[in-house]
Amino acid sequence: NIIVIQNETNLKNLKNLKEYTFDDLKIELKEFVTYYIFNNKNSNFPTSKFYELWESIFYSQNYNMKNFAHKDFEFVNLFFLKNYESHLQCGIIDFQSAFIGFTGWDLISLLENPRINFTRDYNDKLIEYFYDNTSIIENFNTFLEQYYVLSLARQTRLLGRWRKLLS
């Protein structure tokens, strides 16, 4: 499961994965600008200021980008392996976007998925459970703030992606 992955992943085995940076985030946010803003005919959108604000927010969070992140850890990429036991029964596919990044990234993919409507209370309990059962060095409030900043970035990107699909 996601907690086992975070607690047992050895970074030495992940040396071929790149660390997530603001440049990666900017590429993702560009989907919002390109497809959502410009397709909605908003020519007055302050693109440079938008990226500057996101850059400021990103660096103010002081992320500890030292954990494995699948990045597309959604239910459609998980499957049941009946011949295994415990956490090994959860098979995971679709690794092409994996990187070294924020501890809670895959939790964001699961809980903040706009196609699945968990209650905020349910999500909050699962976030706290994840935090309490992983080796996160940040205090809980810092982790939570980082979680929500990256969740917002993900939702912003998805607005662009969905707008593109409607074009």
Predicted feature residues:
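A cross-family kinase active-site recognition segment
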Residues: 1-44, 64-66, 90, 99
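Active-site acidic catalytic loop and adjacent metal/ATP-binding pocket
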Residues: 5, 55-107, 117
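Conserved short hydrophobic patches within well-ordered secondary structure
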Residues: 9, 70-71, 159
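Central P-loop NTPase core of STAND/AAA+ ATPases
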Residues: 43-53
